């Protein structure tokens, strides 16, 4: 198991899976799921990305809990990725299934999970979702998985706050106090970068590492990572739905050339 080193401002590449068993879009064959996952992960790693985050992106429309077939399939793919690559591996069980994410992480030896709704109460396409923090922390303790890092979104993309007066600083402070190992700030949707002012506000409110969770690109990597402590990158690496290694390399060249962190 490898943890994320936030001092290195990691770039975490998304491995978006095709539809899994138990969902409407599943083809009936796990072969293409494995093949695309392994190919995308290989392109990310060969392109210079330092960590991987696997997610059941193809299972849309999401529910708040994964079915047993989905959990089994996500675990199977994650296990193959864990065995094939030395990079830190994370689990995201979309939309907010902390139980599946933590259980899979413990079972396969993944180093971190992403929990989109950790302390907020939000309205999403799958209904009203409450904070996962109390149950997630109890489960992590029961699994004896304290080594699994929790990356917690605040006021996450594709949702509306049920209590809109809550500031993003308040959400970030609450996430930190509830045990998040890092805080994720997103724009309103995938591919949409969060306002730099929002990143600064969160960074000023907490001591935990702050990650950019959407919209990071070679054109804004310097501005965003001059403030933030790393980024999760998916959309900007893709061409025709798959990871494009040259796009990864192009981004990483910009990242390395512009990032004078010290």
Where are these regions (language model features)?
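Catalytic cores of alpha/beta
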Residues: 96-109, 171, 205-233
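Conserved anion-binding
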Residues: 17, 24, 104-182
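N-terminal amphipathic alpha-helix/helix-capping segment at the start of soluble metabolic enzymes
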Residues: 1-28, 136-145, 262
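Hydrophobic faces of well-ordered beta-strands that scaffold small-molecule active sites
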Residues: 11-15, 52-54, 89-93, 113-115, ...
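Glycine-rich, proline-tolerant flexible connector loops at the mouths of alpha/beta enzymes
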Residues: 49-73, 120-125, 180-194, 238
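Active-site mouth loops of central-metabolism enzymes
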Residues: 16-39, 89-97, 152-169, 212, ...
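Glycine-rich phosphate-binding active-site loops on the catalytic face of alpha/beta enzymes
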Residues: 108-126, 178-190, 214-217, 227-248
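Alpha-helix-loop-beta-strand connector modules within alpha/beta enzyme cores
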Residues: 13-14, 63-91, 131-152, 194-217, ...
């Amino acid at each position: 198991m490898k943890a994320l080193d936030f001092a290195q401002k990691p770039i975490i590449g998304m491995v978006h899976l095709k539809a899994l068993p138990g969902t409407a879009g599943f083809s009936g064959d796990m072969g293409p799921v494995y093949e695309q996952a392994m190919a995308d992960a290989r392109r990310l790693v060969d392109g210079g990305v330092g960590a991987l985050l696997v997610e059941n992106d193809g299972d849309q429309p999401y529910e708040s809990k994964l079915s047993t077939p989905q959990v089994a399939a996500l675990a199977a793919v994650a296990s193959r990725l864990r065995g094939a690559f030395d990079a830190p591996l994370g689990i995201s069980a979309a939309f907010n299934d902390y139980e599946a994410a933590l259980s899979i992480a413990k079972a396969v030896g993944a180093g971190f999970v992403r929990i989109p709704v950790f302390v907020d109460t939000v309205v999403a396409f799958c209904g009203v979702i409450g904070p996962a923090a109390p149950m997630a922390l109890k489960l992590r303790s029961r699994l004896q998985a304290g080594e699994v890092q929790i990356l917690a979104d605040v006021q996450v993309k594709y949702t509306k706050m049920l209590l809109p007066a809550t500031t993003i600083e308040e959400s970030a402070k609450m996430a930190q106090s509830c045990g998040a190992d890092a805080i994720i700030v997103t724009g309103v949707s995938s591919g949409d970068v969060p306002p730099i002012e929002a990143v600064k506000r969160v960074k000023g409110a907490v001591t935990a590492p702050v990650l950019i969770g959407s919209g990071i690109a070679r054109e804004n990597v310097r501005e965003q990572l001059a403030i933030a402590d790393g980024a999760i990158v998916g959309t900007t690496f893709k061409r025709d739905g798959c990871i494009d290694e040259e796009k990864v390399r192009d981004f990483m060249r910009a990242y390395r050339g512009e990032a004078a962190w010290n």
